[in-house]
UniProtKB/Swiss-Prot annotation:
GO terms for biological process: aspartyl-tRNA aminoacylation. Residues 193-196 are annotated as: Aspartate. This is Aspartate--tRNA ligase. The gene is aspS. Keywords: Aminoacyl-tRNA synthetase, ATP-binding, Cytoplasm, Ligase, Nucleotide-binding, Protein biosynthesis. It catalyses: tRNA(Asp) + L-aspartate + ATP = L-aspartyl-tRNA(Asp) + AMP + diphosphate. The lineage of its organism: Bacteria, Bacillati, Mycoplasmatota, Mollicutes, Mycoplasmataceae. It is found in: Cytoplasm.
Length: 574
């Protein structure tokens, strides 16, 4: 039989109709001579009623069995307002077991007390939980909004290759050996960057793609070895054009998915100010907690360890009194950043306490009250160090304080652009300057004359879209002048041979007329994670890898046969 309705469809308007439903048994309850079954599918839950006359139909039915029923829709005596179908129930006349189920390794409820690797091993069961299905539904809705919006904005969806040439700049590539071309390898692309720029030279004008990308890097809660991007590029466009259309798109997504309004234009914060105020280039603006530099306050201090004009005293003040346990947690965090501990000062009802309180002068106390606008109570957390290191520490402490005091408001979305990034960063490992983004990012106009000789101060036309402390998008104006591109290659010390080997095929296209262009890539996994309030991007991906990059369900990656290796001309060295 073919089902007439889903399990989330029947309402008061269907009373007295004969229906056929199919789904999984969520729960069986006996009440006197009656048996109640909650039947579930992706769309919802419908309550079934089996009376004494048909009780034999369910003798062998258990939870998670897949069944089919025929019955009549009646009005429920007790309404369940939590269900769309809560006004009705179905009196079962016929029941057929489609497939049985063994006892599941964990309860398939939203709140489940089981470790993540077990969930990933039985991912097909984990995905039966409503919260997981809702995550995938929201993700699909986001993709649908993106496609409609960009198509309506004259963007063309174009697919780019998954088998590409390895370009060693950046993260590690996943390599794929070629059987037909012995001893040669494809790389799975870290992004479609070069291909989408070639599409601009091809005259496509406006391109987008929802694309899978691959990076062989260490994992964390917001990273996977394979991930999904919204990738787009615009010809005859500047950074402003890309940022404007990005703002309109994210505004539409949040409105349609969360009914949340954002105001345009978004706040813009320079990289320098982001680090100075928040200790991060992706600050969470749902809470304030700005970082202050206190060198002027303590310039004549008697506190010995703060008396070093070559270092920076950085501090955060929160209008709470931290407990001994909370301070110890921050001390442990400081050690992760190679600081011995943090210092703290407490203020309550005009009384000062803490590790530095007894050494404070009256003038320093007055200046601290003024600096942080302290009212009744506060804890100041501070330390001293080189600017970059101490800023990173205080940025991490800022996040920890927000978690301690529940300042990360749910269903609130704070977005901003971080701009004016450094064009280069110095690699201690390679002992040279490398491109902070990628070597095709244009320097800012005011840096064009000396970006390759004044690398320390050179800024880039790059921009990151940040939401609730996560970078959800990053893009830039591209270099389209071959002379400037060559200077960029020289600046990052790529030899003529390296450029020709890695990028010659790409650079050749610039001989034939390239429009100026700009673009951006969004991390759709991260956006979905934030919008669904999930703890990890693994909760918004159907079949993710665990924190070690392992597919617990299929046990990939795994060994392959000697024959397969031989065909690829590969020999394992033990």
């Amino acid at each position: 039989m073919k089902r007439t309705h889903t399990c989330g469809e029947l309402t008061i308007n269907n009373i007295d109709q004969e229906v056929i439903l199919q789904g999984w048994v969520k729960k069986i309850r006996k009440l006197g001579a009656m048996v109640f079954i909650d039947l579930k599918d992706r769309y919802g839950i419908t309550q079934l009623v089996v009376d004494q006359q048909h009780i034999d139909l369910i003798n062998n039915v258990k939870n998670e069995y897949v069944i089919e029923i025929k019955g009549n829709v009646v009005k429920r005596k007790s309404i369940n307002k939590e269900l769309v179908t809560g006004d009705i129930e179905v009196i079962v006349k016929e029941l057929f077991i489609i497939n049985k189920s063994e006892l599941t390794p964990f309860v398939l409820e939203n709140d489940v007390n089981v470790n993540e690797d077990t969930r990933l091993t039985y991912r097909y069961l984990d995905l039966r939980r409503p919260v997981m299905q809702n995550n995938l539904i929201i993700r699909a809705k986001i993709n649908h909004i993106i496609r409609n919006f960009l198509t309506d904005s004259n963007f063309l969806e174009v697919e780019t290759p998954y088998f590409a040439k390895s370009t060693p700049e950046g993260a590690r590539d996943f390599l794929v050996p070629s059987r037909l071309n012995k001893n040669k390898f494809y790389a799975l692309p870290q992004s479609p960057q070069l291909f989408k720029q070639l599409l601009m030279i091809s005259g496509i004008d406006r391109y987008y793609q929802i694309v899978r990308c691959f990076r062989d890097e260490d994992l964390r809660i917001d990273r996977q070895p394979e991930f999904t991007q919204l990738d787009l590029e615009m010809s005859f466009a500047t950074s402003e054009d890309v940022m404007q259309i990005s703002e309109s798109l994210i505004k539409k997504i949040l409105k349609e998915v969360k009914n949340f309004e954002i105001k345009e234009p978004l706040l813009r914060l320079s990289y320098k100010d982001a680090i100075d105020l928040y200790g991060s280039d992706k600050p969470d603006l749902r809470y304030d907690l700005k970082i202050h530099t206190l060198n002027d306050i303590f310039k004549n201090t008697n506190i010995k360890f703060l008396n070093n004009p070559d270092l920076f005293i950085r501090a955060i003040c929160i209008d709470q009194l931290l407990s001994k346990k909370q301070l110890e947690d921050l001390n442990q965090q400081a050690k992760q950043f190679h600081f011995n501990s943090i210092a703290f000062i407490k203020f309550e009802n005009n009384n000062w306490s803490g590790s530095l309180a007894s050494q404070l002068t009256e003038n320093e106390k007055e200046l601290l009250i003024k600096e942080f606008d302290i009212k009744n109570k506060a804890t100041i957390v501070l330390n001293i160090g080189k600017y970059e290191q101490i800023s990173q520490l205080m940025g991490a402490i800022r996040i920890s304080l927000a978690k301690m005091f529940n300042l990360e408001t749910k269903d609130d979305f704070k977005l901003l652009w971080v701009v004016d990034f450094p064009l280069f960063e110095f690699s201690e490992q390679e002992n040279r300057y490398v491109a902070a983004h990628h070597p095709f990012t244009s320097p800012k106009e005011e840096c064009l004359t000396d970006f390759d000789t004044n690398k320390k101060d050179a800024l880039t036309c790059a921009y990151d879209l940040v939401m609730n402390g996560f970078e959800i998008g990053g893009g830039s104006q591209r270099i389209t002048n071959p002379e400037i591109q060559q200077r960029m290659f020289d600046a990052v010390e790529l030899t003529t041979q390296q450029v020709e080997t890695n990028f010659g095929w790409f650079m050749n296209a610039y001989k034939y007329g390239a429009p100026y262009h700009a673009g951006i890539a969004w991390g759709l996994d991260r956006i979905s994670m934030i919008v669904t309030d999930s703890n990890s991007i693994r909760d918004v991906i159907a079949f993710p890898k665990n924190s070690l990059g392992i597919d617990m369900m299929s046990n990939a990656p795994d060994l392959v046969s000697e024959k397969q290796l031989e065909e690829l001309n590969i020999k394992i060295v033990k």
